[in-house]
């Protein structure tokens, strides 16, 4: 879909459809009031007959409104004017895009950016509208013989009433389009079936990205290299699979100083997780193809970074692996020596993601990172704690935690901080090794974060548990692309602060 911004007088706008807001009690927004004046009261007469009350998300499509140059006018209910917040605005945009897709309009002129949303500016309103519109038009039908009929809507133009906001509005378009494309890339990768998307497939996507841009280099560590390095925890997880474990490294150099310390993003890439010997229940095991959503997120973010040419040095790691049941599988009771030299007693082979990540987090020390963020569908406990709306976050550095929280608020892609206190570390005590790979049943998301923190003492680090936010299980099944938007916003913020 194409998006544009412009500033012009309403009466001169020619479009297949004009979109304007109406508040509760049939109170016009500024643009709706202008439309009513141009139509000589035609719209207000319709509303007085009860056609639209103005409740949030209500829509009324009008055809051939007198003296209006556009064929259609779409009025959208915006609720009470003083209570218009982020949540309601998103609902308004969702209902608007859905209605436009049903009108048969190829393009539309949207005036909803004039709405005053609590605490939000025009940049935010446009960017959110772009991301939402892209998301609503997303389909994954790669493996369907009969494809869905594509939406007719091809272009949305946002009309800006204040010309001084044109520059920031164009920036919002640029960011929104890039992030939406990154979200789509992450969703496409995560939605791939596990018989196709294995570690080698992730590696091919890394090389594909490198071949597309001179600022990107890709390299892959295979089983033999990891064995020589001593990445025994990582390798143990994949030793029951016929698919080789591969760690793909995507290096982007955008900083003017090539020696500037990089930001490293680590994505858990379990392309399928059976649970291993501690096998998962068969119900919904098919969803365990989504256990690589962390790697898909990193891939999507790297696509955004490339699109925006961010002036940063960034390394993305796709920690590819598959946890399967076999006579060669690792077992409960095994003791593994990690790359860091610390030993881990395996109590549960379904707590495998942290074993892959712990060696990866040690490996990336060689890059002398400024910041490390790992993204992982790590624990069901995080879903119990935070549901499907918030990503769990733990960090060993409060300023980093605050930066991520701020980026999440800006992007509307929310996270919630969890503690990393010593009391939880005691849950990992082992009688025969330095630690166990699981704690007790209580606070499982936190003990998993505590486990990872033991491998991150040499840099500032944050852990994002996306088990509850990475994919939908019921309505609109499939990957969500979260938290691509939040991480992209974090990197945009960083690029601004680092280059002042």
Swiss-Prot record:
This molecule's function is given as: Presumably involved in the processing and regular turnover of intracellular proteins. Catalyzes the removal of unsubstituted N-terminal amino acids from various peptides.
Annotated active site residues, numbered on this chain, are 280, 354
Q: Name one GO biological process term.
A: proteolysis
Cofactor: binding comment: Binds 2 manganese ions per subunit.
GO MF annotation terms: manganese ion binding; metalloaminopeptidase activity
Q: What HAMAP family has UniProt attached to this entry? A: Cytosol_peptidase_M17
**GO cellular component terms, semicolon-separated:** cytoplasm
Where, subcellularly, is it found? Cytoplasm
The cofactor named in the record is: Mn(2+)
Annotated residues that bind Mn(2+) 1 are located at: 273, 350, 352
Keywords in UniProt for this one?
A: Aminopeptidase, Cytoplasm, Hydrolase, Manganese, Metal-binding, Protease
What is the species of this protein? Baumannia cicadellinicola subsp. Homalodisca coagulata
**EC number, as in UniProt:** 3.4.11.1, 3.4.11.10
Protein name stated in the entry: Probable cytosol aminopeptidase
Which top class of enzyme applies to this chain? hydrolase
**Has UniProt tagged this entry with the keyword Cytoplasm?**
yes
Reactions catalysed according to its record: Release of an N-terminal amino acid, Xaa-|-Yaa-, in which Xaa is preferably Leu, but may be other amino acids including Pro although not Arg or Lys, and Yaa may be Pro. Amino acid amides and methyl esters are also readily hydrolyzed, but rates on arylamides are exceedingly low; Release of an N-terminal amino acid, preferentially leucine, but not glutamic or aspartic acids
Q: Name the source's superkingdom.
A: Bacteria
Q: Which residues bind Mn(2+) 2?
A: 268, 273, 291, 352
* Sequence similarity: Belongs to the peptidase M17 family.
Q: Which PROSITE patterns match?
A: CYTOSOL_AP
Principal location class: cytoplasm
* A Pfam cross-reference name: Peptidase_M17
